[in-house]
UniProtKB/Swiss-Prot annotation:
Gene giving rise to this polypeptide: lpxK
DNA repair among keywords: no
SUPFAM superfamilies reported in the protein's UniProt record: P-loop containing nucleoside triphosphate hydrolases
Database matches in PANTHER family: TETRAACYLDISACCHARIDE 4'-KINASE, TETRAACYLDISACCHARIDE 4'-KINASE, MITOCHONDRIAL-RELATED
Pathway where it operates: Glycolipid biosynthesis; lipid IV(A) biosynthesis; lipid IV(A) from (3R)-3-hydroxytetradecanoyl-[acyl-carrier-protein] and UDP-N-acetyl-alpha-D-glucosamine: step 6/6
Entry function: Transfers the gamma-phosphate of ATP to the 4'-position of a tetraacyldisaccharide 1-phosphate intermediate (termed DS-1-P) to form tetraacyldisaccharide 1,4'-bis-phosphate (lipid IVA).
The protein's name: Tetraacyldisaccharide 4'-kinase
The UniProt record lists the keyword Kinase: yes
Native source organism of the sequence: Burkholderia multivorans (strain ATCC 17616 / 249)
Keywords, in A-Z order: ATP-binding, Kinase, Lipid A biosynthesis, Lipid biosynthesis, Lipid metabolism, Nucleotide-binding, Transferase
GO cellular component assignments: plasma membrane
Gene Ontology molecular functions: ATP binding; tetraacyldisaccharide 4'-kinase activity
Domain of life: Bacteria
Length: 342
C-alpha cells in the first residue's frame, strides 16, 4: 500500500474514533454541523411539502440505507433481502449509485462486469444474487432503465440512497452497527447524515459485541455470519476458518468498518495480524508483497476488485451471510403488498 493510502486509512480511523465521543474536536465543528443539518432539513422539507416531487417508478421500492457515514452492513443486508423477497414470490431488482465507478448514465451490472465500471458493492450483489442490478448517480434513472430492461421486476431494492429523496419509496430500512449514532452530532462534528430521530419503517442493528438492542421502535437484530473461506485463484477450493488457526494470518479490509471484519475473524477463533485499508481501496498494486504470512484473509467486497492478474496464492476470501429476522421480512412483505410508492 502506498504512503498516501496508509495515511488515508489512518486518518479514517482517527476521525471515526473522534466521532464516537464529544471531544473538543467534535465541539469545534458543531457550527458546521448546524449548517449541514439546516441544509439537510430544508431538502427533506422540500420533498415532504411537495415543493419538489419524488418520482414513482411504477413498482414498490425498498431503500436499505443508513443515517451514519461508513459501513454498517448494508450490502449483505441487500443480498439477504433480495433472496427473502424472491422466496416470498417477488421478482426483485437492485439499483445503486455505483460508488467508485466511472458511471454517468444508467448502466447494467452483470457478474462479468468490472468493479471499476460498476462499483464494488453492485458487482458483489450481482454475483451473489443473480438479480438485475443497475447503477447510476441518479437512482431514479437507474430504476427506470432497470424496469425498461426487465419488465418482470415487481420490486426494486435500493442499495443505499436513503437521502436520495427524489426516488419515491415504499419501505425504508436503516442499518446501524455497534457504533449506532456515535456522539450524536451531525457531519462533520459527528457521523450522522441525518438526526437519529429520522423516520424509518424499521431499524436493523449489526452489533457483534453485544446482543442488546437500543430502545427504538421496530428494531431488529442483524446477524452477520462468516462462511468457509474460498481461494481467490481457485474459488471451488474452500476451507473452514478454523483451519487457519495455527497459521500466520493477515486480515485485510478496504471497507467502511474494517474492525468489524477483524472482530468476526477473532470470534471464529483466529488471532490475525490486521491491516485496515481505505474504504473502496483500488488495489492498483499488491500491498501484501512484503508480508511474511501463510494466508491473507480479505472480504468479498475487496475480492471483486482483484482480477486474473492477481497471482498471490495466499489470498482467501471470507464470505459473510446476513440473517434477517423473520418478523422484519414479514413487515416488509406486508408493506409491499399493501402500499404504493409515495
Amino acid at each position: 500500500m502506498s504512503a498516501a493510502g496508509g495515511l488515508l486509512a489512518r486518518l479514517e480511523t482517527r476521525v471515526t474514533r473522534e466521532w464516537q465521543r464529544r471531544s473538543a474536536f467534535a465541539w469545534a465543528l458543531t457550527p458546521f454541523a448546524c449548517a449541514f443539518g439546516l441544509c439537510a432539513a430544508l431538502r427533506r422539507t422540500a420533498y415532504a411539502r411537495g415543493w419538489k416531487q419524488a418520482v414513482d417508478v411504477g413498482v414498490p421500492v425498498v431503500v436499505v440505507g443508513n443515517v451514519t457515514v461508513g459501513g454498517t452492513g448494508k450490502t449483505p443486508t441487500v443480498i439477504a433481502l433480495v433472496d427473502a423477497l424472491r422466496a416470498a414470490g417477488f421478482t426483485p431488482g437492485v439499483v445503486s449509485r455505483g460508488y467508485g465507478a466511472n458511471v454517468k448514465t444508467p448502466t447494467a451490472v452483470t457478474p462479468a462486469s468490472r468493479a471499476g465500471a460498476a462499483g464494488d458493492e453492485p458487482l458483489l450483489i450481482a454475483r451473489r444474487t443473480g438479480a438485475p442490478v443497475w447503477v447510476c448517480p441518479d437512482r431514479v434513472a437507474a430504476a427506470q432503465a432497470l424496469r425498461a430492461a426487465h419488465p418482470d421486476v415487481d420490486v426494486i431494492v435500493s442499495d443505499d440512497g436513503l437521502q436520495h429523496y427524489r426516488l419515491a419509496r415504499t419501505v425504508e430500512l436503516v442499518v446501524f452497527d455497534h457504533r449506532l449514532g456515535g456522539n450524536g452530532f451531525l457531519l462533520p462534528a459527528g457521523p450522522l447524515r441525518e438526526p437519529l430521530s429520522r423516520h424509518r419503517d424499521a431499524t436493523l442493528v449489526n452489533d457483534p459485541y453485544s446482543g442488546a438492542l437500543p430502545p427504538w421502535p421496530d428494531t431488529y437484530s442483524l446477524a452477520l455470519t462468516p462462511g468457509a473461506a474460498w481461494h481467490l485463484d481457485q474459488p471451488t477450493l474452500r476451507r473452514p476458518l478454523s483451519q487457519f488457526a495455527n497459521e500466520r494470518v493477515l486480515a485485510a479490509a478496504g471497507i467502511g468498518a474494517p474492525e468489524r471484519f477483524f472482530a468476526t475473524l477473532r470470534a471464529a477463533g483466529l488471532a490475525p495480524a490486521t491491516r485496515a485499508l481505505p474504504d473502496h481501496y483500488a488495489f492498483a498494486d499488491n500491498p501484501f508483497v512484503d508480508d511474511a504470512v501463510d494466508a491473507i484473509l480479505i472480504t468479498e467486497k475487496d475480492a471483486v476488485k482483484l482480477g486474473a492478474s492477481w497471482r498471490d496464492a495466499r489470498l482467501w476470501v471470507v464470505p459473510v451471510e446476513a440473517a434477517l429476522d423473520p418478523r422484519l421480512i414479514a413487515l416488509v412483505v406486508e408493506k409491499l403488498r399493501g402500499r404504493s410508492p409515495a
